[in-house]
Curated annotation (Swiss-Prot):
Disulfide bond residue pairs: none
Gene: MYO1
Subcellular location: Cytoplasm, Cytoskeleton, Actin patch
Domain Myosin motor: 34-713
Coiled-coil stretches: none
Protein's recorded name: Myosin-1
Bias (Low complexity) ranges: 989-1013, 1065-1082
A single GO molecular function term of this UniProt record: ATP binding
Species of the source: Kluyveromyces lactis (strain ATCC 8585 / CBS 2359 / DSM 70799 / NBRC 1267 / NRRL Y-1140 / WM37) (Yeast)
Region (Actin-binding): 402-484
Binding site for ATP: G127, E128, S129, G130, A131, G132, K133, T134
Modifications the protein undergoes after translation, according to the UniProt entry: Phosphorylation of the TEDS site (Ser-355) is required for the polarization of the actin cytoskeleton. Phosphorylation probably activates the myosin-I ATPase activity.
CDD domains (UniProt xref): MYSc_Myo1
Amino acid sequence: MALIRRAKNKVAPQKRAETTIKKATFDATKKKEVGVSDLTLLSSISDDAINQNLKKRFENGTIYTYIGHVLISVNPFRDLGIYTDAVLESYKGKNRLEVPPHVFAIAEAMYYNLKAYNENQCVIISGESGAGKTEAAKRIMQYIAAASSTHEASIGKIKDMVLATNPLLESFGCAKTLRNNNSSRHGKYLEIRFNEQFEPCAGQITNYLLEKQRVVGQIRNERNFHIFYQFTKGASDTYRQNFGVLQPDQYIYTSASGCTSVDTIDDLHDYQETIKAMQVIGLSQEEQDQIFRMLSAILWIGNVTFVENNEGNAEVRDTSVTDFVAYLMQVDSGLLIKCLVERVMETGHGSRRGSVYHVPLNVVQATAVRDALAKAIYNNLFDWIVDRVNVSLKAFPGAVKSIGILDIYGFEIFEHNSFEQICINYVNEKLQQIFIQLTLKSEQEEYNKEQIQWTPIKYFDNKVVCDLIESKRPPGIFATLDDSVATAHADSNAADQAFAQRLNLFSTNAHFDLRSSKFVIKHYAGDVTYDISGMTDKNKDQLVKDLAELVQTTTNPFLSTIFPDTIDKSSKRRPPTAGNKIIKSANELVETLSKAQPSYIRTIKPNQTKSPRDYDDQQVLHQVKYLGLQENVRIRRAGFAYRQTFEKFVERFYLLSPKCSYAGDYTWQGDTLGAVKQILQDASIPTTEYQLGVTKVFIKTPETLFALEHMRDRYWYNMAARIQRAWRRFIQRRIDSAIKIQRAIREKKGGNQYEQLRDYGHRLLGGRKERRAMSLLGYRAFMGDYLSCNEMKSKGAFIKRQAGISEIVVFSIKGEALHSKFGRSAVRLPITIILTPTTLYIVGQTVAQNQVSYTVDRKVNISHIKHVSLTNLADDWVGIYVQGENLPDPFINTIFKTELITHLKQLNRAIEVKIGPTIEYQKKPGKLHTVKCQISESAPKYSDIYKSSTISVRQGRPANSRQAPKPEKKSTLLSDGPSYNSNQSKGYGQQQHAQPSYGQQQQQQQRYAPQSHATPQTTQKKRAPPPPGQQNFAASAAQTAYHPQQASHARVPSTNNAHTQHNRQPAQQAAQPVQQAAQPAATTSQPTRRVAPPPPPPPPTKQNIPKFQAAYDFTGTGSASELPLSKGTVITVSKQDPSGWSLGKLLDGSKEGWVPTNYIVEYKESSGPPPPPAPPVASSTTGYANSNNNAFAANDNVAAVAGAAAGATAGAAVAAASLANPGQNAFSVGLADALAARANTMRLESDDESTGNADEDDDW
């Protein structure tokens, strides 16, 4: 039989899936990558290559592509199912390289940067009309609302209100055009504001240039604003009755273009969503009623028509319509008609009041006045709605940072372009200028300023186009338009002619071209031809004074609210024009965006037919060119993905350097540049990945930045783990301290139950059996469950589960039994002995597929045990006589035999304990077998020899030997508990507890067994030495066991040097043991003390591998791991296992395997006679107790060879101790070593800082 050894920390194959590496699974939903996800990865950079890559991805249903951190979005004109909650969740907490390109990735980056850098964020979405800008803005709002979710009611309400602004403002600000069914006809900049916890707490919407002309007229197949069709189709009966609401085809303003319905638009559903949005935002029912009352008034104003009277002037065709309009506006009907067909003119001379004239209007002029009234009401109504939404969004204070989302009309080129188009295209020019400033121009200028190595890249700067439109000196197009209006304000045609003449000033501008009644501006997106006719009139943007006075007469408070309160008739100041307003708004927008960190989304429209399958190469190629994607790719490939000032960078990442931080505090004493270098060095960032400028650090690739961010995130997790670990140590120390106090109190009151059980066991022997030295130790107590079978995670629990034992375990220990096969009856097999209140289990182990399994070999009912049989010598064999079972009796060997029979006796008082010169048991049912026992000095010191039914054992202590008293603990300044803050190793040398647990013994087995010579540790606690008068020979023997080299040259300690020798550091490695003949020593109770003369120094030890000689033949069981030996064979031994097996190798190195330790003895080479032994010294009981004390305080070098907890026999431990102490009395040496071995075995304490994996309890 061979001992099967397994790796101490080997993980079972089935547990490998519990690592942090997830098992690879096939993602059936992942689409095959088509093209490249980042245009910077293209092999060739050209407009055609970019176009082809976008086309491949579009045809594959992949609409998003990156240029670095810029997102390119191609409108799919269909639902791809990529905005679900599951997709949204997959982007949370991910950087853009971990997930495919998506608008959610841009939103995640914005929200992360807001929290990480505490800086305002914005996203600039640009592209032509119908490219998908509004949809992208909605998806960003969707993601931010989900990512910042919270259970707080007020925060949730703000998020709902922010999301509700989408359907509300889309209804009032979007319309169907030829290019887009949901085209934004106004600009909107939404700021979502966050509190200090980065939760949305407020919002702000800024409106830019509503296209109010659409209210009164649209080109063919376009529609008015969505709200008119929603209201006319979905209005309630109350509204229809009170406001006279009809179907959209009955109103001129909604039916003139010939398009009242669109296949992809559900007006009835959208109307319900609009009503719901009003309720979420907080509009009262009264406010909703007034809004729809004004919409009805606008529609009915459009139905007012005029005819020419006899004088050629205009008059109302049907006054019932004007009467109903006056009812809705709550003004006088006659005054309304008068304002529509007449114009009041007043003349004056200086301060004198002039005459007032009523000038009749013709049909065309009256129609223009009618439309002006409708446009004014709708424009002011829209502004009021935006202001009202802002009031609701600002209801919660505490905003500190914001994320801005810009959704504005795209670049427009129509067959006929007028004032609205030049305003829209001007704003897009400003946005393009921002993009150029921040991504192209300023980036290259910054590289030069920071002295970064850089090759300049050419690009088109559209600042010249912006100056052409907005400049005041020299005057631009808007300034020229204002001058024309001021010169001929009364006559629109004259003003248009004056404007046309002034346009000649721009004839030398390369981006301007004047044609008859038209002019061309060469925008970045292409050349646009504008009509001069009507521009000056649209630029006035002023309500006729008569209409303003009409509105002020209303009795409707809501209508009065949405219009200015008063009209300053005496003001000579020129009122602001529409051009002035749009320039001011655009500059304010640029200023707002410049205060935030921008993200960019460039949208592309694949075709003009809004088809989900068509991809117009020429149209997309044109957009690729004017968006400047090629230049952006070139700069991104050559530039740096991240740049930050030294101060900001250090503030963000100083935690990554231990030289710059301690416990979260900034500790760097040098300048910020030095801190930046130190951080990058400690983070192991290659120098090729960054450059240091004058004031900023530049990081080349986003992967490097993401790595820094990941390390910073992990820092907090590590800190939290350290705090948790320290807290758990503190709590455990309190628990351990409480247990120690409770144990001490219990022992003080009722005595130690384990020692009381031990004393009962001694009485059972009745002075009839010789004792082993370790059985008489003062620290010896009957602990019972030495394998900790009752714990949850232990080897004993594992054995218990495999054996199918469910009862509480009273006693458990390792042992040996004889091989039952004929011819091998002297071979010992390792077993596990488990005793429960009703049953004695003998558990054997088997090996299959390199795994050890445990099964019950014998199950004995305690009530069936008649007697137990032991010899009167110092062996460890026990025969258990069982009656009523047709099976052989158990015949076992265990070092804790006395404790076993003590527990059996307590569980069954009828069991008889037989002690004699022989052991009788039933080797076969009904057939008694007798085993004799004899004294033999050739037997192993700590074990015995079983052969031919005869046990050979050395002489033991007298049968009437008394138990040594338990040594008293010495007072010390050091803590009795383990050092939780020490980084020293926790081995046998550590001061331990009197009561072991499974964790303590198991740590000893896993961490130190098997080994032939344990290395002494330096972590033992320093105790005060005993008085000089109490240092006897046993103490000297113990010191010799731990320090053989020192002891061979040192004299017996005197009074002066006792303290010094006691606290001396242990040697780094024990010397090679020398075989010494054993000499019996008699014990005496006389308190005499003699000092032994020092022995002569031994010859120098040879530094060679220990050699052993086979004392008996060992045939083995045929296992490949065994090493068969014949008597006299000399081998080298590299390891000795406490279980009684040694790893040996033949001298020629041809074979290596395990042999029983009891079968080999140390091989003595001829090296001269050994030194004579020192004479024995008798010691009193007091001296013996103090020798125990010294044995426990000294380093536990002999613990590895004692191996009691690991299942080794006591005889083997005594033999190993004898070999480790040359020149000493055999009995005294064995006693000293036994003291140290048993004490440390019984006092091992578990260490909560152990590196062992406690969770791997099944891996044995």
